[in-house]
Amino acid sequence: MKESILAVLLYLFEYYFSENADLVRDRDSLQNSLIQVGFSPAEINKAFEWLDALAANRPTLTNPRVNGPVRVLHGPELDKLDVESRGFLLFLEQQGILNTEQRELVLDRAMALDQEELDLDDMKWVVLMVLFNQPGAEAAYAWMETQMFGNEPEQLH
C-alpha cells in the first residue's frame, strides 16, 4: 500500500479530535500507534517533520493587506496545485479567511507533501491543519471546519 504524508496527517488530525486523543501523550506512543494502524515509519517521520515545520513557521499576527499585490504562482506550484485548489486559495484570501502570511504557509505546507498533485479536497485539509495551528485564527478555522463538515455552506458576511 502506497501511503502518503497526507494520509498520515489526516489520520493524526482526525484522531486528535476523537475521544481517544488523551490516550496518546508523547510522540513515541503516537508513532507506535500509527505503526500498529499500518503506516510505515518513513511516512510517519515525514508527517512529523511536516508538522514540526508547520509549528516552526507560524506567521506573525498582522493586519490583512487590502488590495495588496497579487500572488503569482510559479512553475512547481502550478504543476502541483490543480485549478480548483488555486481558485480556492484565492477565494479564502479575498474573503479574509487567510491573510497573505497564512496563504504562504499553506502553499509551503502543500508543496512539502509527497504527492505529485493536490486536488481541492487535499487543499482544504492542508488549510484546515494550518488554521488549526495558528493563534488568533479560531474564527477562520471554525468557518473552514463548517465548510468541510457542515451540511450547508455558511455564508460569509
From Swiss-Prot:
Protein's name according to its UniProt entry: Protein Smg homolog
Similarity annotation: Belongs to the Smg family.
Highest taxon listed in the record's lineage: Bacteria
Gene that specifies this protein: smg
PANTHER family (alphabetical): PROTEIN SMG (PTHR38692:SF1)
Lineage, broadest ranks: Bacteria, Pseudomonadati, Pseudomonadota, Gammaproteobacteria, Lysobacterales
